A protein has these predicted regions:
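Short loop/turn and low-complexity linker motifs enriched in small/turn-promoting residues
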Residues: 30-36, 48-52, 125
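A general sequence property marking short-to-moderate contiguous segments
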Residues: 4-25, 45-123
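An N-terminally focused, membrane-permeabilizing/fusogenic/translocator signature enriched
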Residues: 23-33, 37-42
Length: 207
């Protein structure tokens, strides 16, 4: 079918990174950019793509990129056939504290820049990681604070965080992430190895 042939995640991601709008064929196929994050200092990026509701074949996936030399190169990509509802963003005041920051997905791939720098000496212990995590946050959250970086949350509440981690044999932990309101209040936090954010954890301890 035409809408199936017109979707190439890597090419769509590269258009987003270059600041260009999606091609007509991408829009015709119902493809939308759910969220994106570029850490220019680390030279990594992640683009979250989906297909609008109503299409018979769902698209929901992330492409990771790393700057190698003067160009962006795809590190990894993947996704599911699950539909992603872009409407009905929850409010933590109505839905409860667990909806303030909900983990959706994550992924990581070996650094292409490190791989090229090593040449024939392909030792995984010397290769860093390019990683991402996706979340849906409540309506009370305006942005995520990741170190010195501020990542604005789109209106639908889905947001993605990209980072680069140093070499290790295992997938890297995330950087500390805080969900922040419009007035600068830290609503909840998620540490490098946490399975639950601080607000959800506090609500469980209080029960």
């Amino acid at each position: 079918m035409a809408y199936a042939r017109s979707y190439d995640p890597e090419s769509v991601g590269l258009r987003v990174l270059s600041g260009r709008p999606l091609r007509w064929r991408h829009r015709l196929a119902g493809i939308v950019v759910v969220a994106s994050d570029i850490d220019a200092d680390a030279g990594v990026a992640a683009i979250w793509l989906a297909r609008r509701a109503g299409w018979p074949i769902a698209v929901n996936g992330v492409c990771q990129f790393e700057r190698v030399g003067n160009s962006w190169q795809c590190v990894s990509g993947g996704g599911t056939g699950e539909k992603l509802p872009l409407a009905g963003r929850p409010s933590a005041s109505r839905s409860g504290p667990a909806s303030m920051m909900t983990h959706v997905s994550s992924g990581a791939g070996r650094s292409r820049a490190d791989r090229e720098a090593l040449g024939l000496q392909q030792d995984p212990a010397k290769m860093g990681w390019v990683a991402y995590e996706t979340f849906r946050v409540a309506a009370e959250v305006a942005h995520l604070q990741v170190g010195a970086r501020r990542i604005k949350v789109p209106q639908h509440g889905y947001v993605i965080v990209a980072w680069k981690a140093p070499p290790s044999y295992v997938s890297p932990p995330r950087p500390p992430i805080a969900a922040v309101s419009d007035d600068g209040l830290r609503l909840t936090e998620l540490g490098p190895n946490d399975h639950l954010d601080s607000l959800t954890w506090a609500s469980l301890q209080g029960d």
